[in-house]
Amino acid sequence: MEKLVLIDGNSLINRAFYAMPVLLTKDGVPTNAVYGFMNMFFKMLSEVKPDYVAVAFDLKAPTFRHKMYDGYKATRKPMPDDLRPQIPLLKEVLKLMGVAVYEKEGSEADDIIGTIAKHTSIQTYIYTGDKDALQLVDGETTVYFTRRGITDIEEYTINNFTEKTTLVPSQIIELKALMGDSSDNIPGVKGVGEKTALTLLQEYKTVENVYKNVGEIKGKLQEKLIENEQTAYLSKKLATIDTDCGVDTNVDNMRIKTPFPLAVKEKFRELEFKTLFNREELFDQTSVEEGGNDYSLEKIERKTVASKEELSVFSKEKLTALNFSSSEITIYFGTGVEYVVPIRKTLLDDGFSLSEAFEIVKEYTTSGANVIVFNKKDVKRFLLDDLSAQFTAHAQDLSLVKYLVSQAGGSQTLEDLLSEYGYQHTYPAYAIYSIYDQLYKKLKEDGLTSLYEEVELPLSDVLFEMENAGFKVDIGALNTASEKYAEILKGLESEIRALAENETLNVNSPKQLGEVLFEKLKIGKGKKTKSGYSTSADVLEGLEGAHAIVPLILKHRQIQKLQSTYVEGFKPLIDKKTGLIHTSFNQTVTATGRLSSKEPNLQNIPVRDDEGKEIRKMFVARGEDRVLISADYSQIELRLLSAFSNCEPLISAFNSGRDVHAETASKVFNVPLSEVTSQMRRSAKAVNFGIIYGISEYGLAKNIKTSNQQAREYIKTYFETYPEVKAYMDENVRFAKEHGYSETVLKRKRYIRELQSSSYPVRQFGERVAMNMPLQGSSADVIKKAMIAVSNRIKSENLKSQLILQVHDELIVDAFESEKEIITKILKEEMENAVSLKVKLTVEIGVGKTWFEAK
């Protein structure tokens, strides 16, 4: 039976820090916490013998709990100065060991652990010093709680849990809701301690039941409960681990490989961990054949190159690994020698200037060369930005191969990859060569070579060109918007101060706002924390109808976010010379194959509201003789659903250009097409799109504001009307359960381990993924093929217009007026014919001087 160990990194390193005596290296680096953690780690390995291990860490950024409750963890003492630098040090050691390290902004280590534990069906062991994790105990999950130091550990299983606690695991949340938790500053019900809380839970089981029967409870306790009802429910939310926080749950990425690479032993020597350094059984002392997971220093030679003549004996046509860093360029020809071109940082250092170093390897970046790199787009960016050089070699991209083989998504650096596969970080070119050899074989086995060679690899070049092209921003419009929003904010602040009867009120101060709302205006009771009353969005939205000041505060925050995130947020990203924004496209992040972007994230701009429209008006064509052309797929996922399910009524409706939503409404509501109301059509549209995502009756009811029963009837009638769709969705789930993954029209795979979970909600989530992945992933495949085709047509027809942006199902071209008609024709032809289906793909074209006008 396979075993998975999940470790709360922050919790255990904290325990180790206080359990171990002070340890410093000769350079004064504190290491006691890392040393203690490593001892616990190796003890765990010998006792549990896990197949998979992951260590989760908190990030410094506020979590969703801080946003929910300002006082969350507010009473925590600052981290000791000697502990703070040991956390990144521990992460470095773990990554060298090839141990999976997880962290996620907005979530805590508990949430990461809970998500992985609940989305896998492997016997799981959680190591933590935080009792919150006890709520995760079930038939497949055991919690090892570190009570004191690093050796006093208590085991909690589903069999001994009630005996140890008098509760069932889920009641840990209920307990904290009632009695609070001083360590996390969870308030609970004031005046209710552990004994009283346990008594209540023995009788009523849950907080909800306590309040349902609060009339039975007598005296002061009843008063305390009634007075603190909102606080109890808030505390329950704060204490509940988020088991769906969005981290990668593919355990293949957590496989533990022992013994560990010699790089770990070298790190232990550097940290002066003599006992661990001398434990020879921990390390791989043998040389492994090429393609293995490690290679001893004795086997691979590193040779410093003094001139390009030394490399001239190697044919550039032979597949070669090449890596660029700030300190060196390394190249590996498959001969057991990694050639190194050192780059000096100052004139006094040994080595070459960057341009001199590049001249030595330049031959391997030009046409005719066959190379392997990690992230081709980044290599091209480095050469262009730092050396004004073009990268024209025929390049294989290890980052893309890894992405397609694992298809888990999530950004990965070369260092992460080397750690994952147990390679020396000091031999990057050799590691790239060897890992590529392993993964390309897997790529072929999985039938993904066409997707890699015909889509992802050429798309990398298209994205590079789009990043270079950039998007023109009307700086005048941006400044006008900035002034406009500043005026709106100023006006809102005046209104708020007038209603508060306080001309000096700082509207941006939660403390001052809280005092005005809850003490002066007496709007509700408010929850006072150490730093003042909570004025979070949840709190204010609950008070919106209570006083005219509340919606003004919410509006102020909305405009302020718009101002800071987009208007002011764009300004530092605009190239001062050209006035262009150059977003960066992420090709290997999402599990579905969709692209994302950053700096700025142009895919997150609101689409339908007025604010989003205002932002789009700021993006303009590059000159008076240019326009923006937007080409947007119409209902692409619904069209794919129709084709894949072979649903003739839907296929006929789409191919005839009829209103699919109106026809669906007519059938679901059993009325003639002529009698379909706008409300019926909206509801049918929600059903059509909801089906794609495996929507529940509850989700549909919430969307269209109806009862669960009515929503259930709509879904039932829909599937009776379109039985082919129901059969297709069921087949998607069956296929995924049988094979462990779903796949797209181009055979892109997404592995869905949630389908094997013993937890019903987790399995349901897996089923929804299985239903949706073939549609959402195929949509990504289609637009990627279209992007390549459009780019190739623009080049082959010698046009000057440029493809500049992809957002969801939309492509944007900055086109010359003289090329407007031909670009429109190219977009329509290439996008609508990207794949051959029974259903016509339709593209809606818009033209304008701004993105808003074109959209």
Go through the PLM ranges and name each one.
Residues L23-L24, A74-V247:
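Extended two-metal-dependent nuclease catalytic cores across DNA- and RNA-processing enzymes
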Residues Y52-A54, E105-G106, G129, E301-K444:
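Conserved DEDDh/DEDDy metal-dependent 3′-5′ exonuclease domain
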Residues Y332-T335, V405-T426, A431, Q587-P672:
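Function-dense linear segments that define catalytic or interfacial modules
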